[in-house]
Amino acid sequence: MPKEEVEVLIEGGKADPGPPLGPALGPLGVNIQEVVEEINRKTKDFKGMEVPVKIIVDTETREFEVKVGSPPTSAIIKSELGIDKGAHEPRHETVGDLSMEQVIKIAKMKFDDLLSYDLKTAAKEILGTCGSMGVTVEGKDPKEVQKEIDEGKWDDLFEKYEEEEE
């Protein structure tokens, strides 16, 4: 049974039969409206964020499977801050400030997609993205907050979030 894969970037909860979906799925003979409804159902929690979606179609039976990826870290940060864009010159411009709790929340959302082995290193990866976007954390440069994590300043907060997991 031959399978075809279609990968697209869709705004959460706002897929429609037009491009890029319609033209990509049309030749595969699948019911495009059913695919759109399934994508919107699975991405509704990511409203306002671009989400990678993979549609796997069995070209014989016309059955399909929708797999939703995690939005890019930058999209989650922008959503948390309620902004449209990062800074044009991140070293000289600040577009927003996240709390350490928000950084940890994002790290938990992205954990499976990151190379990190624990929540602290995941948070440091998120801080790296903040730095490249012109986003401060707790009013400080994200590099400074990364050093504070290494020094143990945020250990109590990390322990609180790690206990919630158990």
Curated annotation (Swiss-Prot):
CDD domains in the cross-refs: Ribosomal_L11
Any Pfam family: Ribosomal_L11_N
Keyword presence, Ribosomal protein: yes
Single GO BP term: translation
Keywords assigned: Ribonucleoprotein, Ribosomal protein, RNA-binding, rRNA-binding
Disulfide bonds: none
UniProt xrefs under SMART domains: RL11
UniProt GO cellular component terms: large ribosomal subunit
Single GO term (MF): structural constituent of ribosome
Reported function: Forms part of the ribosomal stalk which helps the ribosome interact with GTP-bound translation factors.
HAMAP family named in the record: Ribosomal_uL11
Subunit structure: Part of the ribosomal stalk of the 50S ribosomal subunit. Interacts with L10 and the large rRNA to form the base of the stalk. L10 forms an elongated spine to which L12 dimers bind in a sequential fashion forming a multimeric L10(L12)X complex.
Family to which the UniProt record says this protein belongs: Belongs to the universal ribosomal protein uL11 family.
Protein name: Large ribosomal subunit protein uL11
Lineage, uppermost ranks: Archaea, Methanobacteriati, Methanobacteriota, Methanomada group, Methanopyri
